[in-house]
Amino acid sequence: LMLDTGFDKHLDAMRMLMANMMHETCNFVYMKEISNGLAYNNRPDLGNGPDDGPKYKGAGVLQLTGKFNYQQLADEINDQKVMQGVDYVSTTYPFTSARVWIEKNNLLGVCLNQGFDACCTTINGGWNGIEDRRIKYALCQREMK
């Protein structure tokens, strides 16, 4: 993932991405979002209709979320089975889903030009879990040399 997206050439950006992946997956334990996904129903910003939330809840190391993002992944990798939802993506494409999202959203550019907080809000869409993300970022700064 780091090689495929260019993060391998930028140590601090790599730390930012690693910290966020650690947060999103509870240290790489969960490749599917723990919540039931109902909060994502009727979210046009995600491309979700009335019942799409649970099907298109977070999957993979960056917790790809929303019908729109799932369709982008399906189109990019030419696999329409992605539209089966979270179970398929979380087991089949946990890292590929992140790669495609990173590229589509220029996350490396965000990290390099705007820093850690912007990286977090780009990934999460808000400040959810920011304290844990900061703790993990500090850990990555200490351990990733």
Segments (PLM) and residue ranges:
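Extracellular low-complexity, O-glycosylation-prone Ser/Thr/Pro/Gly-rich "stalks"
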Residues: 121, 125-145
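Extended serine/threonine-enriched, polar tracts that run as long, contiguous segments within proteins
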Residues: 99-108, 123
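A generic secondary-structure signal for well-formed alpha-helical elements
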Residues: 24-28, 68, 105-106, 127, ...
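Acidic helix/loop microenvironments that form the catalytic cleft of cell-wall polysaccharide enzymes
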Residues: 21-24, 111-130
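Peptidoglycan-targeting cell-wall enzymes and recognition modules
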Residues: 13-102
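Second-shell loop/turn segments in exported
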Residues: 3-7, 51, 81-89, 120-127
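Surface-exposed patches in mature extracellular/periplasmic domains of secreted proteins
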Residues: 5-17, 30-33, 108-120
